[in-house]
């Protein structure tokens, strides 16, 4: 009798092109994957996979089986969504996260997932959006929260929230009592997101103007480092103000009023289409609800205003 687990294993071997990838996806060993495939081929009585090349590919019989495997996995996900107990969902979900989310609502999401799906484990990796995009398309992660949406074949997106970019500095710099022009800001080192990130390129272009001397642009992959440098008065930070609410509240940083127009960062959940997307979609639903309640501060005039809620 054909085992459902063997069908699922076959689907992921074909989808990922390797036994190793399927093992990582299903949180098991490569020998266990090989054993399941061998058992499935014995029960079906045909060869299902070509193993002669670096990338495993389905035989003609394997391609036929793949059509049924996708239907079966999809039906199982539909059945679990309609009938199954949410707490019964189990497995490992590989989540890639941009650091801005780490500093805002990721802890709340983890708590919500633990409560709603106690048997679902999250493997969390923090990286910049370009690398998260690459890893998602390579199927090394199942879900990414990144600056998006991501435009690529087979990718599904859901916008989560917008974070306006703030111009922030230590009060020790004495910049908080007037509206600053770009020439005023350019006199100080500018501290922001790492190279290859969208915010870095935006900041670089804003200060790349005729008649303006080259700025000292400090880029860091660690937002904690950016915040620390700004608090110490080492420069002006250009980051979302929402991630430094504590520093703003206790006076270690202040939000500067400027004539710069910087577009907000739009964060989205991005994942690949798959017959088995139930766990991903449940986590995305939780993330959307939490992100929708994130506070945003646009500029210095908003510091004393009531919190606004990001709407979809």
Identify the residue ranges that each predicted region occupies:
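Flexible hinge/capping segments at coil-to-helix
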Residues: 152-195
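Short amphipathic alpha-helical coupling segments at ligand-binding clamshell hinges
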Residues: 61, 65-67, 105, 202-203, ...
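Short helix-loop hinge/linker segments at domain boundaries
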Residues: 46-48, 52-56, 63-64, 74-96, ...
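Beta-alpha-beta core module
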Residues: 153-159, 163, 225-274, 282
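N-terminal helix-turn-helix
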Residues: 1-67, 101
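Hydrophobic hinge/microswitch elements
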Residues: 128-132, 137-140, 147, 201-256, ...
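Central regulatory/effector-binding core of bacterial HTH transcription factors
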Residues: 90-153
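Secondary-structure junction motif
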Residues: 189-210, 277-284, 293-302
């Amino acid at each position: 009798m054909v085992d459902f687990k063997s069908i699922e294993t076959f689907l992921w071997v074909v989808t990922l092109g390797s036994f190793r990838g399927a093992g990582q996806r299903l949180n098991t060993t490569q020998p266990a994957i090989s054993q399941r495939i061998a058992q499935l081929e014995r029960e079906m009585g045909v060869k299902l996979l070509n193993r002669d090349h670096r990338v495993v590919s389905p035989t003609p019989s394997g391609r036929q089986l793949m059509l049924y495997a996708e239907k079966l996995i999809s039906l199982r996900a539909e059945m679990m969504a309609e009938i199954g107990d949410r707490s019964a969902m189990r497995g490992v979900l590989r989540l890639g996260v941009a650091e801005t989310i780490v500093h805002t609502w990721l802890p709340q999401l983890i708590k919500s997932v633990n409560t709603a799906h106690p048997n679902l484990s999250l493997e969390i990796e923090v990286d910049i959006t370009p690398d998260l995009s690459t890893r998602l398309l390579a199927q090394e992660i199942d879900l990414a929260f990144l600056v998006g949406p991501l435009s690529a074949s087979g990718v599904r997106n859901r916008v989560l929230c917008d974070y306006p970019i703030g111009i922030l500095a230590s009060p020790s710099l004495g910049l908080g009592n007037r509206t600053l022009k770009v020439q005023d800001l350019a006199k100080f080192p500018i501290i922001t997101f790492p190279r290859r990130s969208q915010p870095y390129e935006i900041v670089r272009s804003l200060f790349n103007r005729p008649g303006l001397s080259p700025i000292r642009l400090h880029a860091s992959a660690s937002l904690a480092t950016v915040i620390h440098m700004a608090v110490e008065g080492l420069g002006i930070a250009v980051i979302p103000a929402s991630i430094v609410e504590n520093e703003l509240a206790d006076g270690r940083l202040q939000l500067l009023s400027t004539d710069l127009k910087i577009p907000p960062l739009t964060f989205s959940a991005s994942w690949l289409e798959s017959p088995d997307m139930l766990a991903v979609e449940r986590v995305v639903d939780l993330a959307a609800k939490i992100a929708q309640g994130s506070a945003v501060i646009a500029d210095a005039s908003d510091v004393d205003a009531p919190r606004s809620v990001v709407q979809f």
